[in-house]
Design a protein with these regions (language model features):
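Intrinsically disordered, low-complexity regulatory regions
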Residues: 1-72
């Protein structure tokens, strides 16, 4: 299933192949939002040949805006 590939996708995002240390609540919240964005991208990719997944595209906009708000 899709959830089984999420770990590989997540680790591929980070240059050293490992998730950075979570030192503050803000770090945890940003990582959570990054995972949310990745999940929406994954769902869209799985539906790509059928024209995409509109709800996931919309949710991605929302999660990305939230991530921007938390970015220093």
């Amino acid at each position: 299933g899709k959830y089984q590939k999420m770990g590989t996708l997540l680790l591929a995002l980070f240059p050293d192949g490992g998730i950075p240390a979570i030192r503050e609540e803000r770090d945890a919240a940003r990582l959570n939002l990054l995972i949310d964005c990745l999940g929406k991208l994954q769902r869209y990719a799985y539906a790509f040949e059928r024209g995409g997944h509109k709800d996931s595209a919309h949710d991605l906009i929302v999660y990305a805006a939230m991530l921007e708000e938390m970015t220093l």
